[in-house]
Amino acid sequence: MLMVVLAVGLTAFGSGCGDGGDSGAEADGTEPLGIGNEVTVPIAAAMVTTVDPGEEPRSLLRPSYYNGTIQAVTLRTDHRIQQQIDSQQVRDFSSPALTIPMTATTDSGGVELTLGSVTTPDPALSEALTAADGTHAGFEMSELGGITALRLAPAPDTSNSARAALEQAFYQAVYRSVTFPDEPVGVGAVWRVQQTVGGGVDLDQVTTATLVARDGGRLSIRLDVTQTPKSNIWDLPNEAGTLDIEDYAMQGSGDITVDLGLPLPIAGSISIGGHQVYRDPRTSTVLRQAIETNVSWGG
C-alpha cells in the first residue's frame, strides 16, 4: 500500500536505506542506513542572522574547549506518531523512548561519542540494545558550534532495529542543536538559524534563539522552532510513489544550557509537535499524522 509511516524530516537519517535486500533487516522490520558499516551523514549548512545583539557587554560566542576535553552527558529522546488513514481507526506508530548515556571527547575533527548502556521501556528494543554497548558516534563541528556532519559506528553485534533507533535519536538531536551568531552579542540577544532538514520532504527549519542569561561561559538559551516543507510533494522512500501535502504545521520550543568549555549541552529540553495531512493523488486516500518529538540533555 502506498501509505507509509514516516516522521517527515525526523527519520531521514534512518530511512535513506539501500535496496532492501538484507534478510536481517527484514527480520527486524527496520532497515537502517549503512547497514553493518560506519556511516557519515553531512548536515546542511546553517545560515545565521542576528536579529538583536542584546545588552552590553557583548562578546563573540565561541566553543572554547581544548582537544581531549571529556564530558559525560545523557541524551533522551521520545518520538510519538498517531496516524489515521481516511476514517479508519487511529493507530500508534510511536518510536520507543531512548535514554542514551555517553562520553564525549573532543579532538581536532569535532566530538567523538562512546555510548554506554542505552535503555528504553520497550522490552523487545531493550533486548536488542544490549548488544549496542560501546557503539561510537561523532559530530563534526563548525567554529560557530554548529554540527556539520553526523557519524555512527555501531558495535559489531548491534541489530538493525537497535541501530535504526539510535540513528533516529541522534538525527533528532542534531536538528535541535544551536549555532552561534558571527558577531558579538549580549544577554537578550536574538538570532535566527535557518537550515534545510533533508528527507523525503525537504523542510525549511527556522530556529529563533534568545540568550536569556549568561554566567561566564555558561549560557541559558531559549529556542523556538518552526518547520515548513519546501515542496508540496512527499517522495516516498524506495520509489514507492508520492503524496500531495495538503497541510503541514510543525513548531515547538524549549530551553537549553550550554557551557562554552564543553562540546554538548549540559541541560535542557526542546519539544516539537504538530500535524500533517497527505493525499494519495492516485486514490484520493488521506493520511493524517499527529507528531510530537522531545529531546533533552542532562546528567
Feature-to-residue mapping (PLM):
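Acidic, serine/threonine-rich low-complexity disordered tracts
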Residues: C17-E127, V193-G299
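Sec-dependent N-terminal signal peptides
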Residues: M1-G9
